[in-house]
């Protein structure tokens, strides 16, 4: 069926092309398609922003010079049900490892530390009404702040996901 459609399209394209330029030959397979050929789009780590981690369990992903910051799954599990988030104001300038807020749960409170230097450009307003998003979706909807990066080379000092997993195993032992 697909080959029939391709041949029909090719024939239509050739007839249109021939009408506008009769001297030009139409190749039998102008797009070099073979029967059964399928073009796929792959998504994977190479196409996605890489998540980096700190020893204090914050993570950051970057896109176009903007970092999105949150806490790791390990941290949210250790905290328990988050009931309150204290976040900085937009425009706050942070240096790497500066304290920028806190999360409170029924079990404990934990300070938040900036993984990189930069300026806060956005805070997750949804956490004011629903701080439990940190527990439900710590890597997606439960992000904390977005920030510009004043020194992107600091990313190199953070742990990859694999290194972070090894780090967690080492502190659990």
UniProtKB/Swiss-Prot annotation:
Give the transit peptide, as a residue range: 1-48
**Keywords for the protein's UniProt record, in alphabetical order:** Lipoyl, Mitochondrion, Transit peptide
Cofactor note (record): Binds 1 lipoyl cofactor covalently.
Q: What compartments host this protein?
A: Mitochondrion
Which cofactors must be present for this protein to function?
(R)-lipoate
Q: Does the keyword Thylakoid apply?
A: no
For the Lipoyl-binding domain, which residue ranges apply? 66-148
Q: N6-lipoyllysine is carried by which residues?
A: 107
Q: List the GO biological process terms.
A: glycine decarboxylation via glycine cleavage system
Offer a single GO CC term for the protein. Answer: mitochondrion
Stored PANTHER family: GLYCINE CLEAVAGE SYSTEM H PROTEIN (PTHR11715), GLYCINE CLEAVAGE SYSTEM H PROTEIN, MITOCHONDRIAL (PTHR11715:SF42)
HAMAP family from the entry? GcvH
Which family does the UniProt entry place this protein in? Belongs to the GcvH family.
Q: How would you summarize the oligomeric state and partners of this protein?
A: The glycine cleavage system is composed of four proteins: P (GLDC), T (GCST), L (DLD) and H (GCSH). Interacts with GLDC.
Q: What does this protein do?
A: The glycine cleavage system catalyzes the degradation of glycine. The H protein (GCSH) shuttles the methylamine group of glycine from the P protein (GLDC) to the T protein (GCST). Has a pivotal role in the lipoylation of enzymes involved in cellular energetics such as the mitochondrial dihydrolipoyllysine-residue acetyltransferase component of pyruvate dehydrogenase complex (DLAT), and the mitochondrial dihydrolipoyllysine-residue succinyltransferase component of 2-oxoglutarate dehydrogenase complex (DLST).
- The protein's name: Glycine cleavage system H protein, mitochondrial
Taxonomic path: Eukaryota, Metazoa, Chordata, Craniata, Vertebrata
């Amino acid at each position: 069926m697909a080959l029939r459609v391709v041949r029909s399209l090719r024939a239509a394209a050739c007839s249109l092309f021939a009408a506008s330029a009769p001297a030009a030959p139409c190749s039998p397979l102008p797009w070099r398609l073979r029967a059964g050929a399928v073009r796929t789009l792959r998504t994977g780590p190479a196409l996605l922003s890489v998540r980096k981690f700190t020893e204090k369990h914050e993570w950051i992903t970057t896109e176009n010079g903007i970092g999105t910051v949150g806490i790791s799954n390990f941290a949210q599990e250790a905290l328990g049900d988050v009931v309150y988030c204290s976040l900085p104001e937009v425009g706050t300038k942070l240096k790497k490892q500066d304290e920028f807020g806190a999360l409170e749960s029924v079990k404990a409170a934990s300070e938040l530390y900036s993984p990189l230097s930069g300026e806060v450009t956005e805070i997750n307003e949804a956490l004011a009404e629903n701080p439990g998003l940190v527990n439900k979706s710590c890597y997606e909807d439960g992000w904390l702040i977005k920030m510009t990066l004043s020194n992107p080379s600091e990313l190199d000092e953070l742990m990859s996901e694999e290194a972070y997993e090894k780090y967690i195993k080492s502190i659990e032992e």
